[in-house]
Curated annotation (Swiss-Prot):
Superkingdom to which the source organism belongs: Eukaryota
Binding site for ATP: 39, 81, 100, 126, 375
Species of the source: Caenorhabditis briggsae
Domain free text: The TPR repeat-binding motif mediates interaction with TPR repeat-containing proteins.
GO cellular component: cytosol; HSP90-CDC37 chaperone complex; perinuclear region of cytoplasm; plasma membrane; protein-containing complex
Keyword annotations: ATP-binding, Cell cycle, Chaperone, Cytoplasm, Nucleotide-binding, Stress response
Protein name: Heat shock protein 90
InterPro entries (UniProt xref): HATPase_C_sf, HSP90_C, Hsp90_fam, Hsp90_N, Ribosomal_Su5_D2-typ_SF
Family statement: Belongs to the heat shock protein 90 family.
Amino acid sequence: MSENAETFAFQAEIAQLMSLIINTFYSNKEIYLRELISNASDALDKIRYQALTEPSELDTGKELFIKITPNKEEKTLTIMDTGIGMTKADLVNNLGTIAKSGTKAFMEALQAGADISMIGQFGVGFYSAFLVADKVVVTSKNNDDDSYQWESSAGGSFVVRPYNDPELTRGTKITMYIKEDQVDFLEERKIKEIVKKHSQFIGYPIKLVVEKEREKEVEDEEAVESKDEEKKEGDVENVGEDADAEKDKKKTKKIKEKYFEDEELNKTKPIWTRNPDDISNEEYAEFYKSLSNDWEDHLAVKHFSVEGQLEFRALLFAPQRAPFDLFENKKSKNSIKLYVRRVFIMENCEELMPEYLNFIKGVVDSEDLPLNISREMLQQSKILKVIRKNLVKKCMELFDEIAEDKDNFKKFYEQFGKNLKLGIHEDSTNRKKLSEFLRYATSAGEEPTSLKEYVSRMKENQTQIYYITGESKEVVAASAFVERVKSRGFEVLYMCDPIDEYCVQQLKEYDGKKLVSVTKEGLELPETEEEKKKFEEDKVAYENLCKVIKDILEKKIEKVAVSNRLVSSPCCIVTSEYGWSANMERIMKAQALRDSSTMGYMAAKKHLEINPDHAIMKTLRERVEADKNDKTVKDLVVLLFETALLSSGFSLEEPQSHASRIYRMIKLGLDIGDEDIEESAVPSSCTAEAKIEGADEDASRMEEVD
């Protein structure tokens, strides 16, 4: 030890922190390299900043870089930078005797279960070196002081001594003596992997000293020896004959020689810091692939910077296709990487992007956020809220750009339409803008249409936008609900995606036009005076039948009314304006964790609407008026109700009793007697259930109705 070496004790909190780092098992020890490179980058930032006003500061070394040197023989890893360097006082104070404000906070966070990777966010990243090293030596040279060396084996104290390192004209060199069980951190492959993951876009070259091999030609000594032996055996030789030719004939062989050279690990300069006009599509594609691990090129890109009170740059990509696990709960909420002044802070930063935009990949590089920001601080950060607002706005612009190309937008919508609909459900601020991107099949043609196009085709007397939700386009197109609307020449939007149900709950109107479901009560179609008059007359004429049907069905329906929406169907089931549609009920029944109490009151409000112009309803009305207690009426009403449930998209609570009624009708149609039924394959329980009071004597009358 040098005579001038001084020993210092670590401040109590720092000693405690080091003990915690050394004696606790952490799985992600690799973060030590990120922290030391980040510190080196900060030191380079400082000297670059000083040189703006005092260019002579760079006389001690113009090149600004970070160099990593692994030495497998001595089991050391050295990280050197040509940054501002530290004076003796800096070494003593910053690396041991004065605790940073974050030291205690970080220890408390660690003991509460925080991740070790947050160490840099508390300003104590240097000590992460002890995750992989049992001794650390720091040599540093500042322009205002001589060169000094700091050394510690984390035993509660450290030593500082004058030390001259010819390689270090300015900057800091950290040498770590790697623990026996951590030697894989000396592997070239491992170092490259960590740098690529955490420090790929640091604004200074990161060089790695790599060992390489090259072939070298040397004289083959064995061949020379054997030739000498041949000569000794007595061959006659002309000594003076062409000595040069003899020289040429000397045997050589190739050997492999090891040598060391610097390899730059972060040649990809942060693409987002460059001018978008200077970046080719190929460069964007290459960067997108390295960022997202996607094998395909991106669909669209948005590259922008915001300046003023708040400064940040961002690069956002829309992929070609959605990942298969896009909406899985365990999946990270988004794919945005956050950098602060080119230093990587975290990936999947949830606060930067709403969940419905989780498919957007990209980076955000802020000039204003502090480098030591933690996830907790992010949640409170006003700067982040402003960045988020700007990012969402730029995403809307990106979607606008994609929509300019119809084919491109079609691809995009097939993959990410669900996200846009989820956005309408969740993001009230951008709901209006998002609604412009919706596309639906309609009754007017094969091509999906936007709401804007729908409105442009609306009839003069049409004041509402009509839509129907259902399982598939084929099902909704054949639905009884669209009969009258289509026959009047009004266009109906076909919403066949389960998420559409949630979407239209929030999207009440578009361009001042209310969205109206044709499956719910209160459907108002433009009518002439004559039609209005007929409708009122039908209501009076069918009042008695409506009452009888309500009495028969009791609690199964809330009310029975004359319909203005049916043409060829005898009846249909509609729901109240604020209740669930048949499609929504189907979706909710499929939920494994559904709330049965909600199911009870949301699904109960069903209304039966009857078609006054249909032969079945006319005959049924006559039957009721002739004999209020006609025994076939009850069974016919139940059968009509259950059939209407099915055709309206609902499921039956008792499918077996419905099947039994159908079998009974088939029996009557085929004129089969009871004794044949008993011999058939229908179970006796079904037959018992299917027994209809007074069926035999009224068989002929049912056939008439049929």
